[in-house]
């Protein structure tokens, strides 16, 4: 019999993963806001996987509550995720999913490109998602994982920040074809921030090419999500801490304040 899987936060994405795991025969136990997570850890002391599926804005608060017994089998799927984010909670070998599909309320999930997975439970996750027709690519090294996390951050932050100053409902294809200079400039500044956060240097052309791949994975994907303003605020806070100029992104903030 397959071991139990715990999902902390059953939102739209969490629901997709729950479906995937259940269809592969894994018992799934949700942990919601109203539940005491320590009590759940006492009831399920040795889960196969603890997938933290909460939104980015709730990540720190939830991670601080993850019981010690669960930290060696933790899975993370948030955007804006980097190694320092899990190392801050003494998690050394998590399973990480760079999610490249979206799920909105009342709609089926939509795949952009294959999601990237790395870590002890990568095979379990990839097999489960592929069973519901969500393709995955298993990464073989931490260097690959770091690149893929940075790429996803560049994609999400670029389209969200650009979407704040362009017409409502603009798609990624329109951004890339009609506002390419804006998209590339924002992406370059986001890469600066990612390099400061990681202490690593990246091939910028490769990241820009990866951004374009994401754009054409779903050309009708809308740029500005509900979290766009919060992402801009976080980016500016990091840039201030790092002493980075990022003039185009700062101009966007100034424009929004007019």
Which residue stretches match the model-derived regions?
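Active-site-proximal catalytic alpha-helix in oxidoreductases
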Residues: 144-191
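Helix-loop-beta segment of a Rossmann-like dinucleotide-binding subdomain
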Residues: 12, 101-113, 167-175, 213-223
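NAD(P)-dependent Rossmann-like dehydrogenase/reductase catalytic/cofactor-binding core
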Residues: 2, 184, 188-258
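Rossmann-fold dinucleotide-binding core
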Residues: 74-152
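Anion (oxyanion) recognition and catalysis
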Residues: 22, 130, 240
